[in-house]
């Protein structure tokens, strides 16, 4: 029933519509739905998920990147803005990560190559913070440890700037891509996330109070995955 509910509003092309364009299949909204699918353990062979992956495959550009259609430029948020390099790199890292996760290896490799061409020597990408951990997760999953490590070193210096939402997304991405729980960045991020827990046990979402429950569940999930080496002992009483 949970799987059916998750994909109930899937569009005929396999994608999902965002709040900012209700009649359009968005790459960003579709990747978020794949995030939710992974959270509840949807099988890669699930028919609706296969259609979702096919949608992303068909929307990939010839150079290996992904970008929202220019027809939604007037309403798309900055992270999905067509024609913007930062948004293109973010969507390429996000789509590429999920293609690698659900078996679209050829598409994932093309995305990884596109991102590599924009990686700066110090491990930065000319894009948003979350682009970095998505790219690192993609490269790690594909066996490009050197590229992944460069980005992770860059992210280590940015940890003090991260919110609870940032940290849960970073940890979820890295752990699901195979970065071990004992990794120094994973441990540092986990420790920071512990400190962000509010006295009543919840974590505050970047997206407003209505998303605090989701943020809290994700924080609990990632901390349970790092608990063998983390000092976390569970939610406060």
Give the ranges of each region predicted by the language model:
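Preference for long, amphipathic alpha-helical scaffolds in soluble/luminal domains
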Residues: 1-237
């Amino acid at each position: 029933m949970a799987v059916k509910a998750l994909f109930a509003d899937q569009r005929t092309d396999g994608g999902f519509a965002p709040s900012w364009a209700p009649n359009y299949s968005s790459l960003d909204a579709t990747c978020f739905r794949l995030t939710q699918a992974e959270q509840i353990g949807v099988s890669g062979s699930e028919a609706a998920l296969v259609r979702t992956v096919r949608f992303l495959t068909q929307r990939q550009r010839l150079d290996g990147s992904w970008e929202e259609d220019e027809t939604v430029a007037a309403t798309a948020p900055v992270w999905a803005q067509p024609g913007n390099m930062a948004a293109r790199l973010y969507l390429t890292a996000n789509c590429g990560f999920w293609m690698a996760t659900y078996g679209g290896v050829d598409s994932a490799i093309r995305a990884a190559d596109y991102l590599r061409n924009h990686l700066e020597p110090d491990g930065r990408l000319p894009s948003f913070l979350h682009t970095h951990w998505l790219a690192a997760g993609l490269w790690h999953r594909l066996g490009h440890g050197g590229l992944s490590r460069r980005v992770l070193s860059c992210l280590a210096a940015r940890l003090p700037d991260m919110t609870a939402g940032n940290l849960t997304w970073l940890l979820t991405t890295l752990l699901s891509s195979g970065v071990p729980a004992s990794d120094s960045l994973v441990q540092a991020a986990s420790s920071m996330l512990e400190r962000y827990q509010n006295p009543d046990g919840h974590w505050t979402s970047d997206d407003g109070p209505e998303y605090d429950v989701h943020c809290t569940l994700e924080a609990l999930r990632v901390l349970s995955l790092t608990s063998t080496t983390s000092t976390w002992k569970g939610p406060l009483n």
